[in-house]
């Protein structure tokens, strides 16, 4: 019997400098914290973790590589965090992503994954931005409707949903947003550890 297979998918927040030539490499972000903390707590649990996030990806980029980077791996647990680049490209490149199309593509990814493996467990994390500057705060116009789209998708597909935008911004109330994500998007080690904590709490409920 093969080990339980957990796949992390997403963008740079998931990628975090992983060695793409080594499928076992977990980068330096929350997937590494998840894998190391889980194995430390349960060293005899038969489980494999895979991080296949790619920096810069939007949901349509996930669509383009979904067969090779998700379906062919046949995960038992699929974790997805995507969406901030769909917002970011509007502001740095003048290349917006339609929210309805974003939701449609997101649903198609999960529909395909569930069709491939009806017993698949899905963990969805919503995209987030922390208000480290007025510029980042201005992204709310684009990001908030996208977060609502992710929540609708999660209601229909997720076995566990992690409302990261709310959780991380709540954490920033008692400290400062830069502690968790210096640029408002990419987590610090503290931020990655906090995301991993939320993830493991959600995972425990569906394991």
For the regions a protein language model found, what residue spans apply to each?
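Alpha-helical cap/lid subdomain in secreted, periplasmic
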Residues: 2, 33-48, 57, 61-207
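Conserved active-site regions of diverse hydrolases
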Residues: 54
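Short glycine-rich His-centered loop
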Residues: 2-25
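Short N-terminal amphipathic alpha-helix/helix-capping patch enriched in small hydrophobics
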Residues: 26, 30-34
């Amino acid at each position: 019997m093969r080990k339980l297979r957990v796949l992390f998918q997403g963008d740079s927040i998931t990628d975090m400098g992983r060695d793409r030539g080594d499928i076992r490499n977990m980068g330096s972000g929350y997937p590494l914290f998840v894998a190391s903390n889980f194995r430390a707590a349960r060293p005899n649990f038969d489980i494999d973790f895979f991080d296949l996030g790619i920096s810069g990806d939007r949901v349509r980029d996930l669509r383009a590589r979904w067969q090779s980077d998700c379906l062919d791996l046949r995960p038992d647990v699929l974790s997805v965090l995507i969406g901030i680049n769909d917002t970011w490209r509007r502001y740095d490149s003048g290349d917006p992503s339609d929210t309805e199309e974003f939701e449609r593509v997101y649903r198609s990814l999960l529909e395909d994954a569930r069709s491939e493996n009806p017993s698949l467990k899905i963990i969805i994390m919503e995209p987030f931005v922390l208000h480290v500057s007025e510029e980042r705060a201005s992204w709310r116009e684009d990001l908030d409707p996208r977060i609502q789209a992710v929540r609708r998708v999660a209601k229909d597909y997720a076995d566990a949903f992690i409302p990261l935008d709310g959780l991380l911004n709540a954490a920033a109330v008692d400290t400062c947003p830069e502690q968790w994500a210096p640029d408002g998007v990419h987590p610090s080690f503290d931020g990655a550890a906090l995301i991993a904590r939320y993830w493991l709490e959600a995972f425990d409920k569906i394991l």
